[in-house]
């Protein structure tokens, strides 16, 4: 796998979609909205809850808290031991639900095995569910009336919009059917007028599906699962994956070296979707605060 930073030009002509640069512009807009709220006496607040000591989760949480502080949001990080009981976590979430200084609550996944992610997510007040995972928010998204859009799919849509990618009538293929990325991604693309195919681990002849895609979104957690032979010439390729390769370097679910020879545009790893996910978390938190401010 070849690491490709957003600042490095693609030698074969595939346009690099610079998620880091777009995320910076979004964070600057968030900072302006935070200042406008301050004039009303409101400071957007985000609580990030981490259970256990998973190294990757610690990095994600640290990045989210740092982004909040840089944009002027109030943020608190609560870290608990892996042996915390589910009841204790639910009680803490209930307290945060009732805290008027907190507009958004994020529980970092995955949780320890003895906890039900579904039960924990459902405990978060829907109006503070800035991840967009609560069943109420999933239903609103399904009907085209989202309160919060899940951060990663929301970020992908902003990238496609910024790149001027035509979605109406386009063939969009999503590899990965998770509740966090794949399913909400399908809903957002469908609402934009694309024709959707969702592939999962049971899909027969995956390459035949991906080669039809004008827009290909890959979110499997499997390094290099998609290579250039599986991509339609000129397609827009969005790599949601972030993995550690055998060499210890970050890599995506798409083999960048071969994909860039075929794609018309492609997101790098790192510097692509990751920064956008955090940027859209800030957007959702500010929107939650704006609703309370009236």
Swiss-Prot record:
Protein name (record): Bifunctional protein FolD
Pathway, per record: One-carbon metabolism; tetrahydrofolate interconversion
Biological role: Catalyzes the oxidation of 5,10-methylenetetrahydrofolate to 5,10-methenyltetrahydrofolate and then the hydrolysis of 5,10-methenyltetrahydrofolate to 10-formyltetrahydrofolate.
Gene Ontology terms for molecular function: methenyltetrahydrofolate cyclohydrolase activity; methylenetetrahydrofolate dehydrogenase (NADP+) activity
Residues bound to NADP(+): 176-178, 201, 242
GO cellular component: cytosol
Keyword Oxidoreductase annotated: yes
PANTHER family reported for this sequence: C-1-TETRAHYDROFOLATE SYNTHASE, CYTOPLASMIC, C-1-TETRAHYDROFOLATE SYNTHASE, CYTOPLASMIC-RELATED
Organism: Bordetella petrii (strain ATCC BAA-461 / DSM 12804 / CCUG 43448)
Catalysed transformations (reactions): (6R)-5,10-methylene-5,6,7,8-tetrahydrofolate + NADP(+) = (6R)-5,10-methenyltetrahydrofolate + NADPH; (6R)-5,10-methenyltetrahydrofolate + H2O = (6R)-10-formyltetrahydrofolate + H(+)
UniProt key word Thylakoid: no
């Amino acid at each position: 796998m070849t690491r490709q930073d957003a600042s490095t030009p693609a030698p074969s002509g595939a346009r690099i979609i610079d998620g880091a640069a777009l995320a910076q512009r979004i964070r600057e807009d968030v900072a302006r909205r935070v200042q406008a709220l301050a004039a009303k006496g409101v400071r957007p607040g985000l609580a990030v809850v981490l259970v256990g000591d998973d190294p990757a989760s610690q990095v994600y949480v640290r990045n989210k808290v740092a982004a909040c502080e840089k944009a002027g949001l109030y943020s608190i990080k609560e870290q608990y031991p892996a042996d915390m009981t589910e009841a204790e976590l639910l009680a803490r979430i209930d307290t945060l639900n009732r805290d008027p200084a907190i507009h958004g609550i994020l529980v970092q996944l995955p949780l320890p095995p003895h906890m039900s992610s579904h039960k924990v997510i459902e405990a978060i007040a829907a109006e503070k569910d800035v991840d967009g995972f609560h069943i109420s928010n999933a239903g609103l998204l399904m009907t085209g009336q989202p309160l919060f859009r899940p951060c990663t799919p929301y970020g992908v849509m902003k990238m496609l919009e910024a790149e001027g990618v035509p979605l109406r009538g386009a063939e969009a293929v999503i590899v990965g059917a998770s509740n966090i990325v794949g399913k909400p991604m399908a809903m957002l693309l469908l609402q934009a007028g694309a024709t959707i195919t969702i592939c999962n681990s049971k899909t027969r002849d995956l390459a035949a599906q991906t080669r039809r895609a004008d827009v290909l979104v890959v979110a499997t957690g499997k390094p290099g699962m998609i290579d250039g032979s599986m991509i339609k010439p000129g397609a827009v390729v969005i790599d949601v994956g972030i993995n550690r390769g055998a060499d210890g370097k970050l890599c995506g679910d798409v083999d960048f070296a071969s994909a860039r020879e075929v794609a018309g545009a492609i997101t790098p790893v790192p510097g692509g979707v990751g920064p956008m996910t955090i940027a859209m978390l800030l957007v959702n938190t500010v929107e939650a605060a704006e609703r309370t401010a009236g």
